Design a protein with these regions (language model features):
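A short beta-strand motif characteristic of beta-propeller blades
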Residues: 16-19, 51-58, 62-64, 103-115, ...
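Short loop/turn segments that connect beta-strands within beta-propeller blades
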Residues: 49-51, 99-101, 148-152, 188-191, ...
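Beta-rich, blade/repeat-based domains predominating
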Residues: 18-31, 61-79, 116-126, 161-173, ...
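Beta-propeller blade signature
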Residues: 91-98, 292-305, 356-358, 362
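Short, conserved, GDST-rich strand-edge loop motifs in beta-rich repeat architectures
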Residues: 23-32, 78-91, 278-294, 344-354
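Loop/turn-rich, solvent-exposed surfaces of beta-rich toroidal or solenoidal domains
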Residues: 261-306, 310-348
Length: 387
């Protein structure tokens, strides 16, 4: 075989055209308005939802749960590694990726106890000024690892007994939800050292109507939704965390018709328009929201606390029917003309139930744009921090 190859005329070899195996490029310093990350187990992939174009990916140790620097330069990714792959000595780090090249530029050692969870919200967050990153730990004791992003080092680990998850609250505070319905606020100084921990009772009733951890941040409010569709607003604008008055996503008529929140990412924001988007479904049982996917998105004016429109999750090019199983996650992109994304993982019952896809709509008027077929797996993240 080798001799036969050597006998080929040189002109034949020279004329052969070889395909490249991919394009290596550098992304713009400023994230595109419609860029969205699909973050799943072991990988996070970046796409442009407007063009349905694939932009790149990063490999991750464990579940990918990114946090983005406010200036858009870096992606912070907590990772977990074992010396024998699935066993052995455990090492936890925060890897710092350059957001333009998607290459790792540094890693920061953290306590080997970070919570590995599927929820896209509550495992890691970054302060509004980008100075400190907090990683939620679960062993089952709970604590927060605080990382100084400028020094690229661990500033400290602080216990949050009886509480879980982490949500940034300005430049030097983080809040966590507690098992009895209280909220714990951790305040730190400019070196990342603990200044105080304040526990405030009565944010919610975990027995009567618990909230999901999948909150969204709108300016100085964290908006949580309960299983019954009540919005619990956590005000972080002042020096002390405060509880705003609760309001309902559903009217009495909606409740009588058995409408409920749905999916694994059931809230999204159009920050420029001050609108909250909720993924909902109509079903007789009021189960855990994650156990059912959504068929509609309802849009609310946050200031007026009222619904303004409904968007059916249907692809008119595919016959206008909502696929069996519905949609699991929603996200709103940035910019003056934001897009609404509705993602489904596939595998549902009935015709077409096995095909993953993302429906893309114009968020402001609900008009359909296109469908992204066979998208990367994972939760949805927008690489901007325009809080």
């Amino acid at each position: 075989l080798l001799s036969g190859l050597l006998m080929l005329p040189s002109s034949a070899i020279a004329a052969e055209e070889f395909d490249s195996f991919g394009l290596v490029t550098v992304l713009p310093a400023e994230p595109g308005d419609h860029w969205v990350w699909f973050a799943g187990g072991g990988r996070a992939s970046l796409m442009d939802a407007g063009s349905a174009g694939y932009l790149g990916n990063v490999a991750v140790g464990g579940q990918a749960l990114p946090a983005f620097s406010p200036d858009g330069r870096f992606i912070y990714m907590p990772e977990t590694f074992w010396t024998r792959g699935t066993r052995g000595t455990r090492t936890d780090i925060v890897t710092v990726f350059d957001a333009s090249t998607l290459l790792p530029v540094d890693e920061i050692a953290i306590p080997a106890k970070r919570a590995q969870m599927l929820s896209p919200i509550g495992a890691v967050d970054i302060t509004d000024d980008g100075k400190f990153l907090a990683v939620y730990n679960l062993t089952p004791a709970t604590s927060l690892s605080i990382i100084d992003t400028a020094a690229r080092s661990l500033a400290g680990e602080y216990d949050i007994p009886g509480c879980s998850l982490v949500y940034a609250a300005g430049d030097r505070r983080f809040v966590s939800l507690c098992s009895n319905g209280a909220v714990l606020t951790l305040s730190i100084d400019d070196e990342g050292r603990e200044l105080s921990k304040v526990r405030q009772e009565g944010f919610l009733d975990p027995e009567l109507d618990p909230v999901t951890e999948r909150a969204v941040r709108y300016r100085d409010e964290w908006l949580f939704v309960s299983y019954a569709g009540m919005i619990h607003s956590l005000d972080i604008g002042a020096n002390e965390t405060a509880f705003n008055e609760r309001w309902s996503l559903f009217t009495p008529e909606d409740r009588a018709d058995n409408w409920h929140i749905a999916g694994s990412q059931h809230l999204a924001l159009d920050r420029g328009n001050g609108e909250l988007f909720a993924l909902v479904h109509q079903i007789s049982s009021q189960d855990e929201p994650l156990s059912h996917d959504g068929t509609e998105v309802w849009v609310y004016d946050i200031a007026e606390q009222r619904r303004t429109r409904r968007i059916l999750l249907q692809d008119p090019e595919a016959g206008g029917d909502t696929p069996a199983g519905g949609y699991k996650a929603i996200m709103i992109t940035s910019g003056e003309q934001p897009l609404l994304l509705a993602s489904r993982a596939g595998g549902g019952p009935g015709p077409g139930g096995g095909a993953p896809e993302v429906l893309v709509f114009h968020a402001r008027d609900g008009s359909f744009l296109h469908t992204i077929k066979s998208p990367p797996a994972g939760a949805l993240f927008v690489p901007r921090s325009d809080r």
